[in-house]
Amino acid sequence: KPGGIVTINSCSHAQLRSGFWFYHLIPDAIERICERTCDPAAMASLLKAAGFGETKHAVDPDIVMQDASYFRAEGVLDADWRSGDSIWALAAPDELETALGKARELAETGELQSFMKQHDAPRSEVGQLTFSSAQKI
């Protein structure tokens, strides 16, 4: 209806590639999720074609989708922890096995926390979530 506002929260491709530290363990799954996710620019085009005005995008880099558990590096080795993010379902069995092997190796050498911090650093710039809103014309 004219004047109505739609708000959509989603992850941009940049956020999917750089906003989640553990995604770096499953690079093929990142590409699969990007294929299934509408980037904000494409979303704006679709909304415009559907009769909406200019789409505005907002990112709050302080939002962490998994709250404090996101920063528990060894959580990646726990199936319950992994069930908190659907990207793991897109990892092929061999990719998951490789990822868990790498995470175990990093944990055993005391480097898992460092891996997490290194790969989490871009999140402060790109965030994890984009809020897109547009008004129906």
Q: Which sequence ranges carry the predicted segments?
A:
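Conserved Class I S-adenosyl-L-methionine
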Residues: 53-137
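Short low-complexity stretches enriched in small and charged residues
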Residues: 9-14, 43, 86-94
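Active-site capping/gating segments
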Residues: 31-53
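Short, flexible segments with low predicted structural confidence
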Residues: 15-19, 47-48, 74-75
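Conserved class I S-adenosyl-L-methionine
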Residues: 5-38, 64-69
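Helix-to-beta-strand junctions that scaffold the AdoMet/dcAdoMet cofactor pocket
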Residues: 1-2
